[in-house]
Swiss-Prot record:
Modified residues (N-acetylproline): 3
Gene Ontology molecular functions: magnesium ion binding; monooxygenase activity; ribulose-bisphosphate carboxylase activity
Reported modifications of this chain: The disulfide bond which can form in the large chain dimeric partners within the hexadecamer appears to be associated with oxidative stress and protein turnover.
UniProt protein name: Ribulose bisphosphate carboxylase large chain
Annotated Mg(2+) binding sites: 201, 203-204
Further comment: The basic functional RuBisCO is composed of a large chain homodimer in a 'head-to-tail' conformation. In form I RuBisCO this homodimer is arranged in a barrel-like tetramer with the small subunits forming a tetrameric 'cap' on each end of the 'barrel'.
Location of N6,N6,N6-trimethyllysine modifications: 14
One GO CC term, this protein: chloroplast
NCBIfam families xrefs: PRK04208.1
PROSITE patterns with a match to the protein in the record: RUBISCO_LARGE (PS00157)
Binding positions for substrate per the UniProt entry: 123, 173, 177, 295, 327, 379
Length: 485
């Protein structure tokens, strides 16, 4: 047995401390199809070699601790330990590198995102030998994927339920997000749905506050849905936020939504927690409810480039835990999102098989083995002038959600919804006729304003509104080479 892969049991117990790399750095290791693979961005403290830092990550997120312990001799360390099997420098950074770590599948409980994250992104992120640590990507082996139920229904089943095909779905977050009474809230939902939207939505922090208790909101929103359906002949929905202070209340709200006969409920999966989310997803699957997922709190975890966890990992975890929609950024709106990176995790949400593609931030090939897909939701600071770009970027299998871009229309909520529906239909028709939305988008919208005064009014209001800030989360490049160019 080589010194690099020795087990403590094989050489007898010796009390004391030894370098992590002697046990957990194994560059000769050949990964198995059943291993969970992780790519960590590691920033070690000065004086800590990359090999030791990478091995420390593998150790502290699997079987290791700071000193040798005699109980190591009671198990097979080679079978259960994580292994740092590769290191690569980060382009343009002198003190960062990517550490590749393989974890044996037996370390994780079946069907539990909670347990997976507790190990992989647990205490190791506070390890003093590291200045910063970020989980960039995970490869989930098919053997582990098959232990998860995934989304309650998936993209195709949702389209069949709603009888809507060949275009993105349209939504609107009701604003102001806090302070409306339940009756006025329901009125706004009705006006938006009547005007042509497919969905309206509770904002992430609408739960059950003194100004609007959850049961009242559910009742008035259900009335709005049924009234709008009767008038338009289309199936409508409102994302009723079931998130609560405890799982029992969350399930009570989901049960009431089912009793009302509405098509969809909502959950804040990061603040609510993965255990609660998986339970709600299973209930939705068993009872025919779609599940919309909001990612509130994600930027606390994923926005800093050198520490935390990339959203592509949170997106994969959500697909495993369960959700039919999830917010994914817009690229063009007010929230963080670089184009190629966003398209990378959008594909990870929707597609069945995704090849490794570092140009889009995808570190590993991922096979979902027919786990249902998730619709990405583009939401945040978007309006009718963004419609061509959104349609071109996200394609048909997406939800485009305009809050202020609907309710801020100068003529009211229903005309705002009409403007968005007309803009979307114009873009879809132009695309189907072979026109290039990226280059002809503004012209397509202007042409549509000739037969839609509602769209013309919206275009006039928001013609100057842009959110042109550099994204924090960008692809790694060699800064010296970029300067020379």
């Amino acid at each position: 047995m080589s010194p690099q892969t020795e087990t403590k049991a094989s050489v007898g117990f010796k009390a004391g401390v030894k370098d992590y790399k002697l046990t957990y750095y194994t560059p000769e290791y050949e990964t198995k199809d059943t291993d969970i693979l992780a790519a960590f961005r590691v920033t070690p403290q000065p004086g800590v070699p990359p090999e030791e830092a990478g091995a420390a990550v593998a150790a502290e997120s699997s079987t290791g601790t700071w000193t040798t312990v005699w109980t190591d001799g009671l198990t097979s360390l080679d079978r259960y330990k994580g292994r740092c099997y590769g290191l690569e420098p980060v382009p343009g950074e002198d003190n960062q590198f990517i550490a590749y770590v393989a974890y044996p599948l037996d370390l994780f409980e079946e069907g539990s995102v909670t347990n997976m994250f507790t190990s992989i992104v647990g205490n190791v992120f506070g390890f003093k030998a590291l200045r910063a640590l970020r989980l960039e990507d995970l490869r989930i082996p098919t053997a582990y994927v098959k232990t998860f139920d995934g989304p309650p229904h998936g993209i195709q089943v949702e389209r069949d339920k709603l009888n809507k095909y060949g275009r993105p779905l349209l939504g609107c977050t009701i604003k102001p997000k806090l302070g409306l009474s339940a009756k006025n809230y329901g009125r706004a939902c009705y006006e938006c749905l009547r005007g042509g939207l497919d969905f309206t939505k509770d904002d992430e922090n609408v739960n059950s506050q003194p100004f609007m208790r959850w049961r009242d909101r559910f009742l008035f929103c259900a009335e709005a849905i049924y009234k709008a359906q009767a008038e338009t002949g289309e199936i409508k929905g409102h994302y009723l936020n079931a998130t609560a202070g405890n799982c029992e209340d969350m399930m009570k709200r989901a049960v009431f939504a089912r009793e009302l006969g509405v098509p969809i409920v909502m959950h804040d999966y990061l603040t609510g927690g993965f255990t609660a989310n998986t339970s709600l997803s299973q209930y939705c699957r068993d009872n025919g409810l779609l599940l919309h997922i909001h990612r509130a709190m994600h930027a606390v975890i994923d926005r800093q480039k050198n520490h935390g966890m990339h959203f592509r990992v949170l997106a994969k975890a959500l697909r495993m835990s369960g959700g039919d929609h999830i917010h994914s950024g817009t690229v063009v709106g007010k929230l963080e999102g670089e184009r190629e990176i966003t398209l990378g995790f959008v594909d990870l949400l929707r597609d069945d098989f995704i090849e490794k593609d570092r140009s889009r931030g995808i570190y590993f090939t991922q096979d979902w083995v027919s786990l249902p897909g998730v619709l990405p939701v583009a939401s945040g600071g978007i309006h009718v002038w963004h419609m061509p770009a959104l349609t071109e970027i996200f394609g048909d299998d997406s939800v485009l959600q305009f809050g202020g871009g609907t309710l801020g229309h100068p003529w009211g909520n229903a005309p705002g919804a009409v403007a968005n529906r007309v803009a979307l239909e114009a873009c879809v028709q132009a695309r189907n006729e072979g026109r290039d939305l990226a280059t002809e988008g503004n012209e397509i919208i202007r042409e549509a304003t000739k037969w839609s005064p509602e769209l013309a009014a919206a275009c006039e209001v928001w013609k100057e509104i842009k959110f042109e800030f550099q994204a924090m989360d960008t692809l790694d490049t060699d800064k010296d080479k970029d300067k020379k160019r």
